Amino acid sequence: MFTERDLPEDVSGVRASHATGALVLDCEADFETLPPAQAEELGLLVDALDPTSYPEEWLPPEVPTQLRRYVGTEFTVGMPGDGGVTWTRQTDPPIVFVKARTEGSPEDFLDFLVAEALVEVALDRPEHFLGFFEGRYRDLAAATRLSPADTYQLAVALYDASLGLDTREVFRGWDEEFPRLHDAWVDAGERLQPRLSDLPREVATGRTSFPAAAELACAGVKHGLDVPTPFGALDTEAYRDHGADYAVTWARKTFEKLRE
């Protein structure tokens, strides 16, 4: 199920700089919640395994089934929206998982995703948006009045932007030390840019839902791109400083304007 991944020199350099000792594992299958047998297999590769759980009180009454399962004691790594490369500090040492769904991805971009995960796992940040919002997730749902699935998608995007505010300067600094990874980060941003300028019109005409637009815009924040109103307000020191409180206030004000 799990095999230690051979890392190219630049990705090994990122690990040495940010997450010394972290394991990077290739996975034979896709998974989120690990069955007991696979969790036991994983436990043989690490010194300790301590699954995280969260209070039920943090959840609004209606949430996707996977999120309700996530707050329990089952060992879960990655959730819908987290992509094929995920990380966890529920183990000692921490682990970056490269899941089977990444097969066929461009090599440079996949190596960047692994390097990005190594940078993120070294931060003192939750590995899922629920650990970021905590009880404010209920407030986010109340502020937007979106469906449970759309609220989930918006929360993923908002936390993605928050992480990006902490990581993008690291990626910018790789232009000389790790130029291949830096170029992959830049290329991913350039592919996003054409979509961003039309986002307000797409949302206004119903061609793109607000949560989907937020997903694109918040990815733009991670890449240091110019993002349109109202998402530009997330690319601020205020968001970096005030976190979930800021995100909920932004959502409430934004949806009040959308309802006018």
PLM regions: where:
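Short acidic alpha-helical/loop segments enriched in Asp/Glu that coordinate divalent cations
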Residues: 127-133, 172-185
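Short amphipathic alpha-helical segments and their helix-coil junctions
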Residues: 92-98, 140-147, 230-233
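Post-HEXXH active-site segment of zinc metalloproteases
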Residues: 108-109, 122-157
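Pan-zinc metallopeptidase signature
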Residues: 178-260
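Active-site scaffold of zinc-dependent metalloenzymes
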Residues: 54, 59-114, 118-128
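A metal-dependent hydrolase signature that marks the N-terminal structural subdomain at the beginning
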Residues: 1-78, 257-259
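An active-site-proximal "capping" alpha-helix that borders the catalytic cofactor pocket
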Residues: 152-171
